[in-house]
Structures are given as C-alpha cells and as structure tokens.
From Swiss-Prot:
Role noted for this protein: Catalyzes the uptake of tartrate in exchange for intracellular succinate. Essential for anaerobic L-tartrate fermentation.
Name of the protein this chain belongs to: L-tartrate/succinate antiporter
Keyword field: Antiport, Cell inner membrane, Cell membrane, Membrane, Transmembrane, Transmembrane helix, Transport
Record GO cellular component, one term: plasma membrane
Name of the gene this protein is made from: ttdT
Membrane topology: Multi-pass membrane protein
Organism from which the protein derives: Shigella boydii serotype 4 (strain Sb227)
Disulfide linkage: none
Transmembrane segments: 10-30, 33-53, 54-74, 93-113, 137-157, 189-209, 236-256, 292-312, 313-333, 340-360, 370-390, 393-413, 418-438, 465-485
C-alpha cells in the first residue's frame, strides 16, 4: 500500500474520535467517560482499517488516554481525593493488561506451537493421519479434521495452524490425482480437501480456549467487566457435546454437500509414507515435546484446583527451554507471539478502562430498559444470532471481538437472569464457528480461498450453509448442555 493513497486509514480513527467527542454527553454519563469511549471507538476503527499494525493502534490509544487521563480516565471526584496521583494511577492502568494471566497463557501456547514446528511433531502427526486414513476421500477429510484437532489446543494462532502447518501439507495432495487449481479437474478431490481445511480450522478454533487468540481476549474482557471467568476446563467441558458432534459430522457433511468426484485412491498414502520416511523415526526432541504437551493438557483439564492454567503454560515453556526443545532465541525472535502479546494486553487494558469509567454499567442499564419484558432465553438467543451475523462485516476476528464482545457482555450483565458463563462461552464459540461465513473472516480464509480450488460462489454458498448449521447447533447445545456443566 502506498501511504499517499491510504491516508484515509490514518484519518478515519481520528475523525471518529472527534465526531463522538463533539456529540453531547448522553444522560447518565460523565464527560470523561464519554471522551474515553470516543478514543476507545477510534481504536476499534483503527484495528479494522489497520493503517499500522493492530498492536501499534492499541498502544497509541493507551498512550493518548494515559497522557490525558485527568480528562479521559478519572472523574473529578477521583482527582480531588487526597493523595491521588493521576500520573502513577494512569501508568498502573496502562500496564494492567500485561499482568493478566490470560496474556501469559496465550504467550506460552505460542511457544508450544514453536515447539511443534521446530521438532516437526505437528507435521509428523498430520502425515501419519493422512497415511492411515487417506485411502478414501471421506477418511482423508477426517484426517484433516483430526490433524487440526490435535494441534489446536497448543496453537493459539489459527493462522499458524491452518495456513502454516495444515495447508502446506494438504496443498500437495490434489495434484497427486491430477486435480489442478482453477481447472475443471479441481472438483475431482481438491475442492473437498481445501474446504475441509478451512472448515476444520474454524471448528477447532471454537473447541479449545487456547485454539484462537480472540477466545482468550473474550475471557479477558469478561473478567474485566464482571470479575467472572471461564477456565480451560470449563470451556472444554462446555463445548464437549458440540465438539464431538461437529468433528464427526462436518467431514461427512462436506462430503455430501460438496462431493468429490474421486472417492478413493492410493497416491496420497504413498506420498505421506515417502514424506515420513524422509523425516526418519521419532526423535528424542519430538518425544519430549509430546510428553510435555500431554502433561499440559492433563493439567489444563484436571488441575484447575491446584495450578493456574497460565502457570502450567509458563512452567512447560521453562521445561522446553531446559530440555532444549526450543531456545531462548526462539522466544525473543517469535514476532507473531510478541505481536499478539502486545495487542491482546493492550485491548484488555482498554476494556478495563471502559468498565472503570462506568461506561459498561451505563450501557447495561440502557439495554436493561429496552430489553425488559422479554424472556432471558429469548434475549440471549437474539444476542447470539446478531453477534454471529455481524461477522459478515469484519475481516479480522480480533477487531470483531474487540468491537462487539464488550457490548455483548454489557447486555448480558444488564439482565441478571442471563447466565454469564454460558452466554460468554456461546459468544466465544460463535467467534470461531462464524469464521466460516466469508472468505475474509479469519487468517487462513484467504489462503484456502486463493488456492484455486474454491470458486467464489461455492465459498459463499457453503459458508452460509455451514454457518447456519453451526449456529443452530450452538444455540441448542448452549441452552441444553452448557448450563449443566457451567452453573
């Protein structure tokens, strides 16, 4: 992009801030709260347009608020308190997100992903599944799903998982059967495999708390607004029936709705076997990595009463360093991990300020008045449907979550009858599952869309069909199962 032609991306967030700031302060709000909301909204616009990287947008927003904290962050009553030093208080607020346990959990999970990549364990697992299940096209779809499922708990970047590990493997499969991109032969087997790649990425992103960065952002927003939270085990158990159903149903459903011409063949297993032979036997580093990952998953699921999930991740990373699975250079040079670390911490800080200034409680009361007279169940379902469908308007899961999740949480808090843990888990699942709707919804989407095997009309049609199925199943399990295990 040329700066001269993209100047509007820089000006738009500033224009939004100015417009909101000039609007008269709504009744029930203090002026500093309204000005804070103006800057917060400008940050969200910046995250959507990305004139600079998202982490930079968030850090600039925090800097503006902290420097102007007497007018944006603190009320006159707070400033008048004896001994109140706004300089120290604004600094404490600015760095608050970096001490949040959610931040360190996702950072540790990124290091797990680095271990998978460096040892080759992730690639080996995918190749083994392809070799064992690749004789039939339907089973190959299950191999793609199971590969994503195994990698998802310890790969919080669905882009790294889908576009960095799975896609480079499965893109080699269609040409083995003369199924070429942008050609009539693409439907032979390539279209089915590529659709399975993106749909499996979306499904697994919803199954585990640590499978997608916005999941952890949501929990951070939930905690800052209500002091309630969902553990790794809570998320996993709450999603369990839906997870099992989708993992088993989706490959078959894709096989029926987007049937491949070629139903079976031996070329794929032979290719996978050749690749595995080139990798050699399971090495000691892979074995150590596998042992640590199994241990981490066990503690995440069953150890919540004894050790925090973030501490599990932190300790496992330390062991990975001691066992030389990864090096210190791998940590300091992991740009993706540090990028997510900074923008996620910054967004949690900004969301905390939205709550501290009183905007969330005001917005909740406003919604409570408009929603009175409707049943909590009806309101909850309506909010989930609206949140899900608004996915069409966002090309970033991070911007989507940052913009809409605080409003969803405020709406739920406005009606005490709505079970917040259940509602937030449904919102979290909608982030991942709703990513299937468009070819721009999440990081791997453009990769699979641009593979040449998924025509535009097919992608939008399948996205709508699968998206509707996912939404219906989410609402059903959210109402019938999640309250049983979360309340």
């Amino acid at each position: 992009m040329k700066p001269s032609t993209e100047w509007w991306r820089y000006l738009a967030p500033l224009a939004v801030i100015a417009i909101i700031a000039l609007i008269p302060v709504p009744a029930g709000l203090e002026s500093h709260t309204w000005l804070y909301f103006a800057v917060f909204t400008g940050v969200i616009v910046g995250l959507i347009l990305e004139p600079v990287p998202g982490a930079v947008v968030a850090m600039v927003g925090i800097s503006i608020i902290a420097i102007l904290s007497p007018w944006l962050l603190f009320s006159p009553e707070q400033l008048a308190q004896p001994g109140f030093k706004f300089t120290a208080k604004s600094l404490s607020w600015a760095v608050f997100g970096f001490s949040n346990s959610v931040i360190w959990l996702i950072f540790a999970a990124f290091m797990f992903g680095t271990g998978y990549e460096k040892t080759g364990l992730g690639r080996r697992i995918a190749l083994i599944l392809v070799k064992k299940m690749g004789h039939r096209t339907l089973f190959l779809g299950y191999a793609v799903m199971f590969s994503e499922l195994i990698l998802a708990p310890v790969t919080p970047s669905n882009s790294a998982r889908g576009a960095g590990i799975i896609y480079p493997i499965i893109r080699n499969l269609p040409p083995l059967y003369q199924s070429q991109p942008n050609d009539s032969s693409s439907r032979s087997i390539g279209s089915y495999i590529m659709w399975m790649g993106i749909v499996a990425d979306c499904v697994t992103s919803a199954i585990f708390l640590t499978a997608m960065a916005p999941n952890l952002l949501l929990i951070g927003l939930m905690k800052s607004a209500s002091h309630a939270t969902l553990s790794w085990g809570d998320w996993f158990l709450g999603m369990l029936p839906l997870s099992i159903l989708l993992v088993l149903l989706v490959p078959w459903l894709a096989y029926v709705l987007y049937p491949p011409v070629l139903k079976s063949g031996d070329q794929v297993p032979r290719w996978a076997e050749t690749e595995l032979q080139a990798m050699g036997p399971l090495c000691s580093r892979e074995k150590r990595m596998l042992g640590l990952m199994v241990g981490a998953l066990v503690l995440w699921i069953f150890g919540g009463d004894y050790i925090d999930a973030a501490m599990v991740g932190y300790s496992v990373v330390a062991l990975m360093l001691l066992l030389r699975i990864i090096s210190w250079d791998d940590i300091v040079s992991n740009k993706a991990a540090w990028n997510v670390f900074f923008w996620l911490a910054s967004l949690i800080t900004l969301a905390t300020g939205l709550n501290n200034t009183g905007f969330i409680s005001w917005f909740g009361k406003l919604l409570a008045g408009s929603l009175s007279g409707y049943s909590p169940t009806m309101v909850m379902v309506a909010l989930i449907v609206v949140f899900y469908l608004l996915r069409y308007f966002f090309a970033s899961a991070t911007a989507y979550t940052s913009a809409l999740a605080p409003m969803m949480i405020a709406a739920a808090l406005a009606m005490p009858e709505i079970p917040l843990p259940v509602f937030c888990l449904m919102v979290g699942a909608a982030i991942g599952l709703g990513s299937i709707l468009t070819p721009y919804a999440t990081g791997p989407s453009p990769i699979y869309y641009g593979s040449g095997y998924l025509p535009t009309a097919d992608y939008w049609r399948l996205g709508a069909i699968f998206g509707l199925i996912f939404l219906v199943l989410l609402v059903i399990t959210g109402l019938l199962w999640m309250p049983v295990v979360l309340l």
